[in-house]
Amino acid sequence: MDAQFEKAIEIAFDPRSSHALKSQALEFLNQVRTDVQAWRICAALFTRSPRASDIVRHVSLEMVNNAVHSQGLDAPDLAFVKNSLLDYITRTYGPNAQDQADPANVQNKLTQTLTYLFVALYGEGWETFFDDFLALTSSQNGASRDNLSGVMLYLRILSSVHDEIADLMISRQGNESKRNNDLKDLIRERHMQKIAMSWQDILAQWTNKHDGVVELTLKVIGKWVSWIDISLVVSQDMQNLILPLVGRVNNTSNNIDTVRDTAIDTLTEIVAKKMGPSHKMELISFLNLGGIITELLASQGLHEFKGTSRYDNDLAEVVAKLLNTIMTDVVRVLEDNKVDAETRAKAERHLQDFLPALLRLFSDEFDEVCSTVIPSLTDLLTFLRRVGTLPDSYSQMLRPILSAIVAKMRYDETSSWGTEDGESDEAEFQELRKRLQILQKSVAAVDQTLYIEFLSNLVGNMFATLEQQGPQMDWRDLDLALHEIYLFGELALPNAGLAHKSEPNVVATERLAVMMSKMVESGIANFPHPAILLQYMEICVRYHAFFESHHQYIAPVLENFVHLIHHEHPRVRTRSWYLFLRFVKQLRAQVGNVAKTVIQSISDLLPIKAEVPSTEAEDDMSSDESDHSADAIFNGQLYLFEAIGCISSTSTTPETDQALYARSVMEPLFSDMSVHLPRAKSGDAQAILQIHHIIMALGTLANGFADPNQSQNPNNQRTPPQAVSAEFSRASEAILVALNELNTNGEIRAACRSAFSRLLGVLGATILPQLPQWIEGLLSQSSSKDEMAFFLRLLEQIVYNFKGEIYNILDLLLTPLLQRVFAGLSEPINGTDDEIQLQELRREYVSFVQVILINELGGVLVSTSNQGVFESLVNSIMTIAKTIVHGNIVASRISFNVLARMAQQWGGPDVATIGENPTANGVPAPAFPGFDQFMLTQFHAACWEVMQDINFRPYADAQTRQILNEITGLEQIIYLKTGEKFISHCQTVTFPAVGMGAEDFLRALTSSTDRKAVMAYLQQLLKSRR
């Protein structure tokens, strides 16, 4: 069996084995794994002398490891494993080792197995666990820890034991946590003194002899210190061993000293140990951490080599981690109102002592170092904000802190803006800027006056320098000033982050106006560096309100935008198109009659050149700002078309000129469309894409002309000038021609849907006669359910906006529209996406019918033209109402509301009353014969079909409770319209079918107009019958 098992492992893991042979071997191994006694074979194989191959021993040990950890071996079996492994370890790692130490992967698995044995047996069965492995470290009965292989195994086991029972990063179950705490208590009681002494012995033995041993020892100390007595690691003897390692001079050529860095990390873990405020402040003093950090910052690697390639950024990062831990604890003590005066005084001194070092590391040229101390600086600023009125000792800190934050916002000298190689570095820097912005806001929250004065001076000095140096000025300094202007709005704008409620800081608002004036007057828009131009445009857009009160600056800024729209740098050029639109859109009322000039200036950018993307382009994941593909350029062109629409339709532009400008832009598009349409009809991909782009451009231009306030108040929208509407009617007709020819193409339909929704804003009711053509084109046989749902949403908007003018058009188009929708509702479902689209179509369909009824256009549903689809309409709505499944709850609720509105509108006058003495003597008089009976046999029956559905649980689910609310309303309406017929139907049909009497229900329904009372009865009824 042993030989078979060994051979199977070798075959299974031999890359030269055939697939068939390997499969047989793996199948055999899997069978062996199911044998509860297989671990015995594996233990023997692993400890055998002479040794088996490394792979055989690793697989064997893994199975032993699994047995110890997961199979619940009893005490004798565990003792057998322990004795076998201990005997093997003594032969392999002891002072008189006969065999070579195991490779790293086997040692790792061995250490893990021994750790599991420790967990199982240290309480009882292997009380000498640590003694046994400590004995391996010495060749002279403990006189010195000179056996290297034994020392390394001992340290690995200590590290593994900590990870298993004390690592706070691992989530533990309740029983496991108790077990671990018990084991830690036993270690403290039995062996902690001896283990701590062994660390001293090992450091004394191997310092300057074997860095690997020293580093591993320090890591073990750093792990264990969190849960042992602190005195064991802060004794003078221990510190005499650790501190020289912290400060040792690095003589390596590669500037890396992992022992020194690990020693500093160990200090960090010692400082991070939880303890009372007074003890923590004393610990910081005892360890002389202030002096240590000062010496480290003055070391050659951090001082002399600063700004050179030999700068030791690894050292800077570990020092920053230590300092961040210290400062976090110091601030925590200062925040504690319960600490005594002496402890607080110590914390104050530590704060003053460590702040310069904190700012030095915060200002480090390596952003990783800066980021390491941001948490403690954040804590400090949060504390200062809570203090209220700051004493001088605190207020004096703010200026150097703010200065350091602002300086860190600056691009460093090595940064290369805008290059492909530097994209990731720039993205990381922008993320750092966001974190720095939070710190800067914290300073402003503590002292707004300082913040305003500091940044005003910074910006003022930068513009003074620009005036003196012109284009020779360092772009990084100018970028910093512009970045700070951009952030300054946190104080100066209403409802911004630092503005109290809706009131901005008055002084900040005044200073911002000064900054903006200086910026516009400085000629910065002609600066040669693209980063500055982008910042300039972003600021103009952000502070558009400034131009509303400083009209004199609008014209020069517009001129600058038009210039930058043609900039040679692609990132500036394409970004400027979007920002230009934002600028003119927000200042539409102030830009004046400048459309002719602007159109002439940017007309060279308007011709559309569609390019079918290649497969490589489709796979390119470029960011928006760096994407210079044809598709990205076209999207940018759309911003220009919309901007032209905005500028051309200002209140100061005569209507005839508006129409002229629209025509001048659209005529070339019409011509281009007529040229490409024949090719597009024959399937030419480039021509189809060109038509798509032209349609999108026409729609986007219309969007620019549309009243910007119509979406907020559709009932009070500005009527488009007749001359402008006439021009866009031509656009609508041109698009319809293309749609009619190409409506089998989904992309073309999508572009037409977009254009249609935007043309509504400039055509208003004049588009209504074209609606049948739009429906014919947009709802083709190849239209998806998504497309139908989207178009129904548009029609809801049209019905709402033009309810007084749409009846005749709606009467004409309703039947073909509903027939398309019915076809979509009945299509087979293939997969989750289809199901989601069907749910959306159902919702939009019943919402559309609801909008018709709400706007008193219900007559169109039963008109002569649409009688043929009325029955299908009602049946489809009832089907949706009765479909109580996830994803259809909203549609079901709306459907019952639609049925209630139909009953109210066509059920005739009320023939019954609801109250303490209800009456039901009248004769039903529905709007058309038989509708009263239809309500009973169909609407009423639908209500009770849903209420008997086991998925309908309104007493436990808020969404179905809303459906019950609509059902209750519908039932009361049917009762009011049919009276005694309703009562009789309930008594003879409905309730006998469900096996109960109708009296309680009728009493609840007819005695109160309060729906809640009826719903309460129905909920209780349904709950009792489930």
UniProtKB/Swiss-Prot annotation:
Described function: tRNA nucleus export receptor which facilitates tRNA translocation across the nuclear pore complex. Involved in pre-tRNA splicing, probably by affecting the interaction of pre-tRNA with splicing endonuclease.
One Pfam family from the record: Exportin-T
Keyword annotations of the record: Cytoplasm, Nucleus, RNA-binding, Transport, tRNA processing, tRNA-binding
GO term, biological process aspect, one: tRNA processing
Lineage: Eukaryota, Fungi, Dikarya, Ascomycota, Pezizomycotina
Organism of origin: Neurospora crassa (strain ATCC 24698 / 74-OR23-1A / CBS 708.71 / DSM 1257 / FGSC 987)
Molecular function, one GO term: small GTPase binding
Localization of this protein: Nucleus; Cytoplasm
PANTHER family listed in its UniProt record: EXPORTIN-T (PTHR15952:SF11), EXPORTIN-T/LOS1 (PTHR15952)
Similarity remark: Belongs to the exportin family.
Protein name: Exportin-T
SUPFAM superfamilies: ARM repeat
UniProt cross-references to Gene3D superfamilies, sorted A to Z: Leucine-rich Repeat Variant
Gene Ontology CC: cytoplasm; nuclear matrix; nuclear pore
